[in-house]
Amino acid sequence: MNKTKQTEQKEIGRVKLGDTQDLVVSIVDNEKLDLRIFVKTDSYTGATKRGVRFYLFDNNWTEFKKLIDEVDKTYQELA
């Protein structure tokens, strides 16, 4: 019998993108950051393939945070 490891996913928060879409941020297996679009329509409710997942502990988090800081800086300059 094949045993597959269950994925543990903990939602951190979400941002409403529209009437039927949210951006959901989760930690997966205590080692990966997942940013995923979730939809709620008459025909489907749940995660889509649109999103990104990366490991937190191989310097990706540091680089991603720097990128978010740059986005925030640019946003502040535009506002």
What residues fall within each predicted segment?
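Negatively charged, low-complexity tracts enriched in Asp/Glu with abundant Ser/Thr
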Residues: 1-18
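Detector for Asparagine
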Residues: 2, 30, 59-60
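Compositionally biased, intrinsically disordered low-complexity segments
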Residues: 15, 27-30, 71-74
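A short, structured beta-strand/loop element
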Residues: 21-52
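Mixed-charge, Lys/Arg-enriched low-complexity segments
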Residues: 48-79
